[in-house]
Amino acid sequence: MAVFRTDEVQDADLEAVSLEQITPASSGLLAFFTATVAVFAVSYIISHFGTVSWLDTVIRYIAMISLPVMLVLAAVLKPVRSTILRFWRRKPLAAIGMIVIVLAVATDVYADYVAPHDPEGVGVAKCESGDSTTRKFCGPGTEGAPLGTDNIGRDVLSRLIHGARISMYVGLMTVLIGITIGTVIGIGSAYSGGVFDIIVQRLVDALMGFPPIILALGLMAALGASINNVVIALVVILVPGATRVIRSEALRIKELDYILASRSIGANPVRIMIQHILPNVIATYIVLMTITLGFAIVVEASLSFLGVGVPEGVPTWGSMLEIGRAHIDEQGWLVVFPGIAIAAVVFAVNFLGDGLRDVLDPRLRGR
């Protein structure tokens, strides 16, 4: 039987679930909570693929229903609630960051119901400022457009809400795919060593030698502008860094005594990597995902700002910045609001990433 150990002692104050709090009833609810999280994650991802219209509608409703159920269960279940409260007391900035991310995801899920207007609709405001004929460049506080309208009369608030859908989807999909691929390659490279490890590291060095935005621009020029191509380009950028970090951690773990003992008795290498090394790099995997999420959102916004990201007509925070750039002197709100949205999400994921790193890495506890 495989034995899973960690080489560090977990901090009792930050223990996720204490055994005393788990009763037969709560264990069933915990299983239901876990299933709800999984259902929401899957439906959230699939809902952005643009499948058959009726199926897309069903999947979106599943995501909309599972999100509040998940949040209610998190508040009701004592083990989950106590863990969140401990995290809030110990890492308040990280907890605030988590709230901002949840709000951003909720904005994405309920965008069609929260946004006051169609993001591409024109002439939605009634303003005396700006151009009252075409109703463009209406300032913030305008009736029908609380954050104003843009250069062709579209509601800035509605475009900001729908822009969260693209930014969060691209960011989350990128880190999920990129960090997962990097983890698999990093563990395999560290454990195998030899020629395979050398080849992987040379490829990693070559890809990391390019500035990220330059590499992304080159890939988008080759692939063409689309949401999925943006995800592919960002995955290519993230995989080398994730591979290097996970490989470094896996090299340390594979020299632990119990893993050396497993190897000495002829345990299957794949089994060792999956049952012994992988569980010990999960903490690093989670921290990498949160830290790189902000980076992915910024790069996606940069590509949209440069006009090579998502197709024209799809509202994104980056494309809103590009539109506002030409009118920044007189209509500054066109860049202020999307800029605030990007900054808020990036700061939130960085705060959350730092907090999770401090919690999950025993070497950093107490700082």
Q: Locations of the language-model features?
A:
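Alpha-helical transmembrane segments of integral membrane proteins
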Residues: 152-367
